[in-house]
């Protein structure tokens, strides 16, 4: 419940900021390449949120507190998230300068989406996760977390 809710609000923030930025940039026509860039940036955000949430669950299963698990889970996913976003930003920057017309607009939309995706994954979703977890009385039940029980070998 808790992490899914944080993801939904993070993704809604991503969508609203993305739409606002695209509408404020003059002269960008939304074509098939632009739509694919929007979908790809949204999929990146979902994928990296999932990766961070998986790390949080793994950290919690080792016995850490929920707040500590969130902090170390995001810390573990930071390098992969930043690497992927930086590489894709540089690729879209190269495409932006090496192309014209429809590909030029798609590269601009993808660059914008990569930056917004990184900000929402690393900042907004994490912020909403902390907000809901600070208000939940039964934090562990709120996120449906379970600790792994150590099985004893006989």
Predicted stretch roles:
Residues 1-31, 97-102:
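Interfacial segments of transmembrane alpha-helices in multi-pass membrane proteins
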Residues 2-6, 36-39, 75, 109:
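Short alpha-helical transmembrane interface motifs in multi-pass membrane proteins
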Residues 11-12, 32-50, 112-115:
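Hydrophobic transmembrane alpha-helices
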Residues 21, 48-50, 81, 117:
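Residue-level signature of catalytic and energy-coupling elements of molecular machines
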Residues 23-36, 52-61, 123-133:
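A cytosolic-side transmembrane-helix exit/cap motif
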Residues 58-154:
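Hydrophobic alpha-helical transmembrane segments of membrane transport and translocation systems
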